[in-house]
């Protein structure tokens, strides 16, 4: 027994020695071989770095701040061929590790704010219409500056949208043209727009020139190549996409249950070979010809017949039987499979048609995914699970379908209906990254009215906006500030402006009164103003222009504003009733004088009317209540050209405010009571208030309507037939039972 133990110990020791010798010998030979190579390299003037050499070394204090991709390129540039260098320089992925923190200079923005500079167009350079629309949207925005020294962001005038070498829109020698720009600075603080990249057969995401440290606003970008918090994914849109405005969504009313004729539809090309063909070639497995109609055609391209298969003739025949628009408007879900590239025109078409998109494009970074929650508006599928799509969408509850459909309409109208909205959304996302302390949150981006109309510079608290009271569980304000616009001198104690001031001050909801003195005469003495129970603040306008009545004055301490012309005739009861109505509709204009617009077929232009009809689309701000945020929006969102027009004409400011509020809310204003005459008829004809009797005044308002509609790109005003009266208004009951009894006698 002892002998066996000794033999076992001896055998184990021998095995250990053998293993030690084997591995030790290998390491020794490897080190000797390595030393011989170093010696041989030294004789031939070559140097092979040790593995430690590939780790970045920082010879000075600033070296650690060099982007990592630049370090890697510097360390390995010696060991790649010239062709590999060219490929690397022209690749989209060179700055793949760029982020705002490493490849963007924030100091330019903190100094002058978020301003965007567009390079002047170079002589002889052709620009496609789509790119012209992008540049026009930037130049027409509040972010634009013509001074590069004031700019925070730079946009090329060179057309970078189509980088498919087979396209007639392809711009040659773009690399040298970009490098010659004196402000290029390796792309730092630059934004490059791109819709198409790569070409047949693999359609890579290479844009064909070195973008350096520039950001990409790119369509069909993959999650693999998307640089989070740096690039912006934009939708693929056609050359016919409107520059401004755009059509509204096609959902006119909600149907319960929210099911349509077809459950799932698709009509498009079937790629017989190459990238993107796998999914579309398999769609026939899901098509049932009843409520799931997925149609493809082989008829596209020059040589489709060379590659046609046994199904092509049957597919082409069935493809012609269905009208695409009819399918789109009568389907609950629309399939959006990838094409040659990840993005597809079908995406925006489905959104507009209120057809819930079913995404089948693995690896696609969805448009504006940084701020939009697409799970609220689309079904994200998987190309590998195509056969499970029908059963998946059938299992979605009707309540969820209705919510998805409504969200498609909101997103379409807020961010995608025009090139301008796509561009402005891109810029707002970048601005939020720069000024994170006042950036918009997810609720703002994904709830009405959307991120473009909610300016965080106004406030970082959602309760200061009129759109989120229900979300926050808040009640609308309980007090208002009356702002009286005075343009005539105070010569008599019986003037309408003094009567109006007293009537407003007696309201139980009035917190203060501000008189905006836009008269050429000096301010009257304090004793000329009547004594009231609330503070009266008189502000003398510096410029004395019409737009000054909508400036966001710090003196306005309440969220509600009662806007009044000096010759308005209102009683305290009318003021109280209008305010209580506004508390139920804090995002709208609520008031008394109603006007309407119409389309004049003979003149092919918009018309303005003050006739008493069965509907209206405007409530004039001479006697109306609205949220004070609209003062800020009027001053900071609208372009200077429209405000200058208003000031030059001394007219149309009330129309412009109605345009703005309707564009934001997508809702009409609200008229209260049947009162039609709200102006004092005994005003002196020599006063500025007599402009209402001027025939040119009405003609100017007609012209304003069309100018405003042109800037918005569509007519935002919406007709309404609703009028709100007090309960028991003119009912045959005792007057003592009525709360607003004085209104019936007015």
Curated annotation (Swiss-Prot):
Lumenal side: 29-746
Species for this entry: Papio anubis (Olive baboon)
GO process terms (BP): heparan sulfate proteoglycan biosynthetic process; protein glycosylation
Glycan-carrying positions: 89, 330
Protein name per the record: Exostosin-1
Gene Ontology MF annotations: glucuronosyl-N-acetylglucosaminyl-proteoglycan 4-alpha-N-acetylglucosaminyltransferase activity; metal ion binding; N-acetylglucosaminyl-proteoglycan 4-beta-glucuronosyltransferase activity
Main location, first listed in the record: Golgi
Residue numbers binding a protein: 166, 203, 300
Catalytic reactions of this protein: 3-O-{alpha-D-GlcNAc-[(1->4)-beta-D-GlcA-(1->4)-alpha-D-GlcNAc](n)-(1->4)-beta-D-GlcA-(1->3)-beta-D-Gal-(1->3)-beta-D-Gal-(1->4)-beta-D-Xyl}-L-seryl-[protein] + UDP-alpha-D-glucuronate = 3-O-{[(1->4)-beta-D-GlcA-(1->4)-alpha-D-GlcNAc](n+1)-(1->4)-beta-D-GlcA-(1->3)-beta-D-Gal-(1->3)-beta-D-Gal-(1->4)-beta-D-Xyl}-L-seryl-[protein] + UDP + H(+)
Enzyme Commission no: 2.4.1.225
Gene3D superfamilies: Spore Coat Polysaccharide Biosynthesis Protein SpsA, Chain A (3.90.550.10)
Subunit structure: Part of the heparan sulfate polymerase, a dimeric complex composed of EXT1 and EXT2. Could also form homooligomeric complexes. Interacts with NDST1.
UniProt binding sites for UDP: 267, 269, 271, 280, 319, 324, 346, 349
Keyword annotations: Disulfide bond, Endoplasmic reticulum, Glycoprotein, Glycosyltransferase, Golgi apparatus, Manganese, Membrane, Metal-binding, Signal-anchor, Transferase, Transmembrane, Transmembrane helix
Top-tier EC class: transferase
Transmembrane spans: 8-28
Subcellular location: Golgi apparatus membrane; Golgi apparatus, cis-Golgi network membrane; Endoplasmic reticulum membrane
Disulfide bridge map: 98-103, 109-152, 298-312, 334-355, 652-704
Domain of life: Eukaryota
SUPFAM superfamilies, per the entry: Nucleotide-diphospho-sugar transferases
Post-translational modification summary for this protein: N-glycosylated.
Membrane-protein topology: Single-pass type II membrane protein
Residues on Cytoplasmic side: 1-7
């Amino acid at each position: 027994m002892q002998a066996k133990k000794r033999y076992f110990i001896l055998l184990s020791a021998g095995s250990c020695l053998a293993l030690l010798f084997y591995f030790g010998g290998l390491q020794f030979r490897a080190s000797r071989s390595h030393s011989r190579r170093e010696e041989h390299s030294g004789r031939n003037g070559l140097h092979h770095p040790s593995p430690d050499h590939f780790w970045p070394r920082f010879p000075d204090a600033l070296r650690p701040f060099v982007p990592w991709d630049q370090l890697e390129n510097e360390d390995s540039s010696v060991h790649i061929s010239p062709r590999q260098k060219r490929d690397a320089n022209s690749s989209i992925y060179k700055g793949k590790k760029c982020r705002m923190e490493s490849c963007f200079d924030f100091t330019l923005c903190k100094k002058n704010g978020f301003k965007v500079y567009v390079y002047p167009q170079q002589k002889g350079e052709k620009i496609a219409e789509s790119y012209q629309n992008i540049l026009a949207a930037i130049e027409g925005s509040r972010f634009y500056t013509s001074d590069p020294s004031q700019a925070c962001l730079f946009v090329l005038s060179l057309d970078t949208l189509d980088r498919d070498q087979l396209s007639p829109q392809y711009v040659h020698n773009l690399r040298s043209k970009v490098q010659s720009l004196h402000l290029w600075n390796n792309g730092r603080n630059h934004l490059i727009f791109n819709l198409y990249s790569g070409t047949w057969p693999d359609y890579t995401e290479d844009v064909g020139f070195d973008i350096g440290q520039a950001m990409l606003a790119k369509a069909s970008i993959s999650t693999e190549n998307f640089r989070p918090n740096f690039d912006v994914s934009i939708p693929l849109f056609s050359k016919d996409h409107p520059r401004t405005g755009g059509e509204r969504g096609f959902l006119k009313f909600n149907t319960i249950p929210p099911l349509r004729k077809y459950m799932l539809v698709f009509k498009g090309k079937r790629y017989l070979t190459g990238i993107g063909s796998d999914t579309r070639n398999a769609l026939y497995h899901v098509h049932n010809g009843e409520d799931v109609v997925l149609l493809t055609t082989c008829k596209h391209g020059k040589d489709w017949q060379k590659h046609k298969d046994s199904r092509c003739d049957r597919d082409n025949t069935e493809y012609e039987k269905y009208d695409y628009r009819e399918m789109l408007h009568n389907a609950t879900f629309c399939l959006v499979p990838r094409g040659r590239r990840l993005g597809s025109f079908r995406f925006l078409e489905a959104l507009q048609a209120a057809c819930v998109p079913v995404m089948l494009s693995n690896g696609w970074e969805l448009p504006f995914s940084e701020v939009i929650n697409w799970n609220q508006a689309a079904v994200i599928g998987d190309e590998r699970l195509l056969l499970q799509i029908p059963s998946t969408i059938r299992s979605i509850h009707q309540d969820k379908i209705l919510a998805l459909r409504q969200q498609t309409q909101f997103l379409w109208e807020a961010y995608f209906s025009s090139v301008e909205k796509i561009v402005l959304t891109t810029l707002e996302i970048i601005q939020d990254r720069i000024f994170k302390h006042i950036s918009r949150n997810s609720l703002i981006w994904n709830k009405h009215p959307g991120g473009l109309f909610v300016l965080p510079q106004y406030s970082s608290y959602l309760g200061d906006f009129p759109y989120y009271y229900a979300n926050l569980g808040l009640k609308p304000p309980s007090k208002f500030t009356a702002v009286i616009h005075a343009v005539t001198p105070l010569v008599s104690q019986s003037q309408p402006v003094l009567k109006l001031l007293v009537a407003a001050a007696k309201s139980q909801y009035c917190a203060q009164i501000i008189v905006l003195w836009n008269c050429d005469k000096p301010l009257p003495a304090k004793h000329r103003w009547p004594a009231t129970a609330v503070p009266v603040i008189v502000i003398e306008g510096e410029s004395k222009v019409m737009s000054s009545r909508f400036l966001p004055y710090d003196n306005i301490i309440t969220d509600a504003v009662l806007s009044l012309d000096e010759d308005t005739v209102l009683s305290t009861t009318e003021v109280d009733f209008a305010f209580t109505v506004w508390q139920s509709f804090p995002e709208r204009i609520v008031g008394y004088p109603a006007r309407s617009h119409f389309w004049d077929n003979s003149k092919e232009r918009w018309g303005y009317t003050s006739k008493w009809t069965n509907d209206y689309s405007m409530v004039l701000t001479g006697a109306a209540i609205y949220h004070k945020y609209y003062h800020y929006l009027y001053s900071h969102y609208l372009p200077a050209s429209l405000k200058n027009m208003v000031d030059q004409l001394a007219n149309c400011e009330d129309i412009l405010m109605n345009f703005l509020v309707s564009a934001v809310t997508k809702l009409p204003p609200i008229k209260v009571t049947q009162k039609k005459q709200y102006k004092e008829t005994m005003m002196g004809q020599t006063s500025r208030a007599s402009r209402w009797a001027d025939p040119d005044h009405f003609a100017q308002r007609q012209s304003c309507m069309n100018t405003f509609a042109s800037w918005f790109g569509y007519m935002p005003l919406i007709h309404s037939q609703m009028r709100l009266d007090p309960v028991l208004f003119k009912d045959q009951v005792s007057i003592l039972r009525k709360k607003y009894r004085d209104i019936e006698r007015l």
